[in-house]
Amino acid sequence: DIVLTQSPASLAVSLGQRATISCRASESVDNSGISFMNWFQQKPGQPPKLLIYAASNQGSGVPARFSGSGSGTDFSLNIHPMEEDDTAMYFCQQSKEVPWTFGGGTKLEIK
């Protein structure tokens, strides 16, 4: 299975500043020029919401302050400017190989 290592495990960011979350895969999640890396946001009591798919594409209705980048094994999610509503858990997920696997999560809070 592909192992995803997220960092940091927790992060506190001031309103209006930038939050950066990293995800490293144990092997490349690229195939045919596509990076099969996705990012999800989860709030307590709610199902995960897709933010970013294929490394850098925004999900439907996702605000422009969320962006993703990376390829191969190294990826990042950026949130800028940070808003109060962005307090949540964030997870990377690879969909290159079954079983699809998730990172351990990052808890994002307001500083």
Curated annotation (Swiss-Prot):
GO cellular component, one term: immunoglobulin complex
Entries under CDD domains matching the protein: IgV_L_kappa
PROSITE patterns: IG_LIKE
Further comment: This is a Bence-Jones protein.
Chain residue ranges for the region called Framework-4: 102-111
Region (Framework-1): 1-23
Domain of life, per lineage: Eukaryota
InterPro entries: Ig-like_dom, Ig-like_dom_sf, Ig-like_fold, Ig_sub, Ig_V-set, IgV_Light_Chain
Segments for region (Framework-3): 61-92
Database matches in SMART domains: IG, IGv
Region (Complementarity-determining-2) residue spans: 54-60
Keywords: Adaptive immunity, Bence-Jones protein, Disulfide bond, Immunity, Immunoglobulin
Residue segments, region Framework-2: 39-53
Disulfide bond annotation, renumbered to this chain: 23-92
Region (Complementarity-determining-3): 93-101
Protein name per its UniProtKB record: Ig kappa chain V-III region MOPC 70
Region Complementarity-determining-1: start-end pairs: 24-38
